[in-house]
Swiss-Prot record:
One of its GO terms (biological process) is sporulation resulting in formation of a cellular spore. Promotes colloidosmotic lysis by binding to the midgut epithelial cells of certain coleopteran and lepidopteran species. Active on Plutella xylostella and Bombyx mori. GO terms for molecular function: signaling receptor binding; toxin activity. Belongs to the delta endotoxin family. Keywords: Sporulation, Toxin, Virulence. InterPro entries: Galactose-bd-like_sf, Pest_crys, Pest_crys_dom-III, Pest_crys_dom_I, Pest_crys_N_sf, Pest_cryst_cen_dom_sf, Pest_cryst_dom_II. It comes from Bacillus thuringiensis subsp. kurstaki. This is Pesticidal crystal protein Cry1Ia. The keyword Transmembrane does not apply. The gene is cry1Ia. Signal peptide: none annotated. Toxic segment of the protein is located in the N-terminus.
Length: 719
């Protein structure tokens, strides 16, 4: 599939020491069919040829753009923001021109080499057209009502269209999960499921104004909570199935495996990670969420420079095995860190004075966690005669790489290497963008240009890419064999900030993988797919680690802490700030031993006691206690909630507490009031039963014990 901007090759920086070559003339050269091609011709054909990915950048940009837009509107957005979000999504998923849904289908079909059946394709496209048309009508009605919220007619129209559209999503979602074709349909399912959940959220935001009853609003809310789990589990299951089906043994199979992993993360899993944050009862104000997962762009190596000479493609040139490449490229689960410096060591591949390639042979990476100590890792050859090149990246986001995949031929033995890389970066806190480049020199070799933005495009078009970039470089891996040196870049999402800043007027979600250290006994483990990154685990009591947080004033602002966790045991969570204890509470098991982590095994719980930060920068610590070794306790993230935020669950708890207290006399807390009847106690019991397990499980148990005591007193009195 051709790139839309294939002929718009952006040049390397002006300080480059390489002669510019016309990309148009090169394109013409590569289209010429040559007979009896020789050594020099093969090199000439591949010179500055642009490597085409499976899909245009605009297709991936759709997934990146939608996730990025939603990240900016989490919580309960203003009515105008909701309408604007629908307008954006309609433009992305139902644009004029070629059907975006077909492009999604074709992309996955090509990666996994599986065609969707004609019936399933046509059924899905027909249902998607209907949903798009209905969503556009609802969007127009919503905008009309937002412009005149007191208009009875506008309110009635948007309400009826909302109910009809929501039911339509319920009916049509199964068309995107056809048995046997779940994997190629997965991006479509994820986007449609995401829209359904956003739509269900509207009932909680606007339902009261539209005239929906409390029970109707509750029905939509409960459906949203239930479907969020169902949709999440479906996406993770079929992502994992598709990925495992692509696992192979050689380098070529790794290429498609990695492409599926990257693109399905961008188009599916990033959306799934946001589903819990659509809950308006949990997130009634602006909410900041972060994606900490890593994705990997294609290896920098020549690909098909000539069809009759297959070994000139890096993965056919005696490249390492699938498992060796994974080990070289994908780090073990680790705390989120940021790249600070790269030192590059070069090797020389030489045929003659006019044909040679100085290429990337090894490197030393320096990186650190947020507020942590410097870490160093090395790969490849680091003891070479060529002077190393050191590139500083402290406090800089590398948002784009332009790399040359080089090919040097020794008679019939190709050598694959990387003779040049341009790292485009910007300072995090200043509007200054520039680049550093690695270029030790080469001559007479074949090269192909690989631009990271073809695989990780910016979130939006129409802005400079140093403003709208979606990812930052986090790590570099090296695939190394006797005749292959291929780089693989690792990237994190821009939403994972460098500062762990807590805002006074919004809910701040901080994944625990952003801690700056790990306590003894704690481990980072692979995320289950729906958390947006890796998670932390303990199997015995102790602290997980420390998070360095920065506080935006006012410092008088008070917060409550919430924890998203999963556990095979009842336990206590303890929190502290700068070593001073803040909260301690009992919480219950969410899963059984041996059970897989899925959406329902995670629960978000909170402490009721508020606190303030006294310093601009503080260290927050969380630990798990009072459980037997051998159990498993996982934490996804910590949430800091301004205390002014009131919750329906909190109101219900206070009301239930008052009703329970009212059963007893004021002079004797153990004495039942004389006018309390059996049905009074039953009413209070039902009220306690309706309390949220998520927030007040232990308090609920305590109130039940008091109600039972009241029941016992009533029975004894009647006897």
């Amino acid at each position: 599939m051709k790139l839309k901007n294939q002929d718009k090759h952006q040049s390397f920086s002006s300080n480059a020491k390489v002669d510019k070559i016309s990309t148009d003339s090169l394109k013409n050269e590569t289209d010429i069919e040559l007979q009896n091609i020789n050594h020099e011709d093969c090199l000439k054909m591949s010179e500055y040829e642009n490597v085409e990915p499976f899909v245009s950048a605009s297709t991936i940009q759709t997934g990146i753009g939608i996730a990025g837009k939603i990240l900016g509107t989490l919580g309960v957005p203003f009515a105008g923001q909701v309408a604007s979000l629908y307008s954006f999504i309609l433009g992305e998923l139902w644009p004029k021109g070629k059907n975006q849904w077909e492009i999604f289908m074709e992309h996955v079909e090509e990666i996994i080499n599986q065609k969707i059946s004609t019936y399933a394709r046509n059924k899905a496209l027909t249902d998607l057209k209907g949903l798009g048309d209905a969503l556009a009508v609802y969007h127009d009605s919503l905008e009309s009502w937002v412009g005149n919220r007191n208009n009875t007619r506008a309110r009635s129209v948007v309400k009826s269209q909302y109910i009809a559209l929501e039911l339509m999503f319920v009916q049509k979602l199964p068309s995107f999960a056809v048995s046997g074709e779940e994997v190629p349909l997965l991006p479509i399912y994820a986007q449609a499921a995401n829209l359904h959940l956003l739509l269900l959220r509207d009932a909680s935001i606007f339902g009261k104004e539209w005239g929906l009853s409390s029970s109707e609003i509750s029905t939509f809310y409960n459906r949203q909570v239930e479907r969020a789990g169902d949709y999440s589990d479906h996406c993770v299951k079929w992502y994992s199935t598709g990925l495992n089906n692509l696992r192979g043994t050689n380098a070529e199979s790794w290429v498609r495996y990695n492409q599926f992993r990257r693109d399905m993360t961008l188009m599916v899993l990033d959306l799934v990670a946001l589903f819990p944050s659509y809950d308006t009862q949990m997130y009634p104000i602006k909410t900041t969420a972060q994606l900490t997962r890593e994705v990997y762009t294609d290896a920098i190596g020549t690909v098909h420079p000539h069809p009759s000479f297959t070994s000139t493609t890096w993965y056919n040139n005696n490249a390492p095995s699938f498992s060796a490449i994974e080990a070289a490229v994908v780090r073990n689960p680790h705390l989120l860190d940021f790249l600070e410096q790269v030192t590059i060591y070069s090797l020389l591949s030489r045929w003659s004075n006019t044909q040679y390639m100085n290429m990337w042979g090894g490197h030393k990476l320096e990186f650190r966690t947020i507020g942590g100590t410097l870490n160093i890792s090395t790969q490849g050859s680091t003891n070479t005669s060529i002077n190393p090149v050191t590139l500083p990246f402290t406090s800089r986001d590398v948002y784009r790489t332009e790399s040359l995949a080089g090919l040097n031929l020794f008679l019939t033995q190709p050598v694959n290497g990387v003779p040049r890389v341009d790292f485009h970066w910007k300072f995090v806190t200043h509007p200054i963008a520039s680049d550093n480049f690695y270029y030790p020199g080469y001559a007479g070799i074949g090269t192909q240009l690989q631009d990271s933005e073809n695989e990780l495009p910016p979130e939006a078009t129409g802005q400079p890419n140093y403003e709208s970039y979606s990812h930052r470089l986090s790590h570099i891996g090296l695939i190394s064999a006797s005749h292959v040196k291929a780089l693989v870049y690792s990237w994190t999402h821009r939403s994972a900030d460098r500062t762990n800043t807590i805002e006074p007027n919004s809910i701040t979600q901080i994944p625990l993988v952003k801690a700056f250290n790990l306590s003894s006994g704690a481990a980072v483990v692979r995320g289950p797919g729906f958390t947006g990154g890796d998670i932390l685990r303990r199997t015995n009591t102790g602290t997980f680690g420390d998070i360095r947080v920065n506080i935006n004033p006012p410092f008088a602002q008070r917060y409550r802490v919430r924890i998203r966790y999963a556990s095979t045991t009842d336990l206590q969570f303890h929190t502290s700030i700068n070593g001073k204890a803040i909260n301690q509470g009992n919480f219950s098991a969410t899963m059984n031993r041996g059970e897989d982590l899925d959406y329902k095994t995670f629960r978000t719980v909170g402490f009721t006691t508020p606190f303030s930060f006294l310093d601009v920068q503080s260290t927050f610590t969380i630990g798990a206690w009072n459980f037997s070794s051998g159990n498993e306790v996982y934490i996804d993230r910590i949430e800091f909630v301004p205390v002014e935020v009131t919750y329906e669950a909190e109101y219900d708890f206070e009301k239930a507490q008052e009703k329970v207290t009212a059963l007893f006399t004021s002079t004797n807390p153990r004495g039942l009031k004389t006018d309390v009847k059996d049905y009074h106690i039953d009413q209070v019991s039902n009220l306690v039963e309706s309390l949220s397990d998520e927030f007040y499980l232990d308090e609920k148990r305590e109130l039940f014990e008091i109600v039972k005591y009241a029941k016992q007193l009533h029975i004894e009195r009647n006897m």
